[in-house]
A protein has these predicted regions:
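Broad, structure-driven detector of short, well-ordered beta-strand segments within folded domains
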Residues: 1, 162, 300-304
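Extracellular hydrolytic enzyme modules, especially secreted metalloproteases
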Residues: 155, 168-313
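Propeptide-to-catalytic entry region of secreted or membrane-anchored zinc metalloproteases
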Residues: 2-11, 16-211, 219, 223-229, ...
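Extracellular low-complexity, Gly/Ser/Thr-rich intrinsically disordered linkers
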Residues: 282-353
Length: 353
């Protein structure tokens, strides 16, 4: 394959479909040296998500197995036909595989669904004021819909409900996200509640990608959205695109990495070293990031990226990213899509906090 290299040159590389796990590489220092703690002066109660290990937010779902209900609804004013799982069966598969791989088996997803559309008791227009991005009363619509499916699903064993509507339904333009106490026939339960909207189908998003990004926020307590550029590099930006891996810093914040996944040093002990990195998008054992601790709050992170299972990039896409994490600063998403950056790492959009 012909690839770009340094000095505007091109070179052919021999590719192989057979990839072996990398041999162990000894890290000069333990993982804890590079895993600097959160040093923000304050954390807003309205934005409690973690930027560093350990995650201390009391809303985190800590158990190993997460039970998720994929509940397909249609409406009298918009009936659906066929088996609804034909729309999202591959999303369920990818959802399970992604979480298993990137959590190193520390988390397991269990999904229950229905192979027929469940008719909502009201036409879709009756829920329009409640469902959609940022609408404060989505809980009302969710409780109404869950009542319509209570004979099919046992909510008492669920952690998350994902309401899936027909792809061509235009009543709900945007998606719904909420974690709250929901009144059900099994009592008042704390559930993550999510619902599709027209935009989610036409961005285009893969349903599993959007849902997983939101669960990383609301269920597992991760801030994400840093670094914000390139926007299509991974799941942390929430932007649908070819990159579907999770950056190693976020993986480490979640407690999902194993010690052998990270090569760590600091400025005092740094010397010439050759470290072979596994691409974040590839399911391959080996060092996933090289980190250098700079100060008590700052760590340099270097990662490799390639076209692979979790990176649907164009042929020949490969490279290395480097970013600095500084845990003194909260993630500032203002200007995230405007490309603004003060170049100092304080007004954040292109640099990591």
């Amino acid at each position: 394959e012909c690839r770009d290299i340094a000095n505007n040159q091109k070179r052919y590389f021999q590719l192989s479909n057979s990839v072996a796990d990398l041999p162990a590489q000894t890290s000069p220092l333990p993982l804890s040296v590079c895993r600097v703690p959160d040093q923000r002066s304050s954390v807003s109660p309205s934005d409690p998500y973690a930027i560093a290990y350990p995650i201390t937010w009391d809303g985190v779902v800590k158990k190993e197995k997460l039970k998720v209900l994929f509940i397909p609804f249609d409406f009298s004013d918009h009936p659906a036909t066929g088996n609804p799982t034909s729309t999202y069966s591959q999303d369920i598969t990818k959802f399970k595989e992604w979480v298993k791989w990137y959590s190193n088996g520390k988390k397991i997803i269990e999904v229950e669904t229905s192979d027929r559309w469940i008719r909502a008791s009201q036409p879709s227009i009756a829920y329009e004021e409640s469902l959609g991005h940022g609408k404060p009363n989505s809980k009302v619509a969710v409780e109404m819909l869950l009542k319509d499916s209570e004979t099919i699903f046992d909510y008492s064993t669920a952690d998350v409900v994902f309401l899936i509507f027909p792809k061509d339904l235009k009543t709900f333009q945007t998606e719904t996200t909420r974690i709250d106490y929901i009144q059900t026939n099994k009592g008042r339960l704390r559930l993550g509640t999510y619902a599709t909207g027209l935009q989610i189908y036409f961005k285009p998003h893969e349903l599993w990608f959007w849902l997983t990004h939101e669960l990383l926020h609301h269920v597992w307590g991760l801030q994400q959205h840093a670094p914000a550029y390139p926007v299509y590099l991974g799941i942390s930006t929430g932007t649908p695109g070819p990159g579907q891996s999770i950056i190693s810093w976020d993986q480490m914040t979640l407690g999902w990495v194993n010690p052998e996944d990270i090569w760590c040093s600091d400025t005092k002990n740094l010397s010439n070293a050759e470290v072979t990195l596994v691409p974040l998008e590839r399911e391959q054992e080996g060092v996933r990031a090289a980190m250098i601790n700079l100060t008590p709050s700052r760590t340099l992170v270097v990662e490799s990226h390639r076209k692979d299972k979790w990176g649907n990039f164009n042929a020949g896409t490969y490279g290395v990213t480097a970013y600095i994490v500084d845990t003194r600063y909260a993630t500032d998403r203002t200007g995230e899509y405007a490309g603004k950056d003060d170049g100092k790492g304080i007004l954040y959009t292109k640099v990591a906090n």
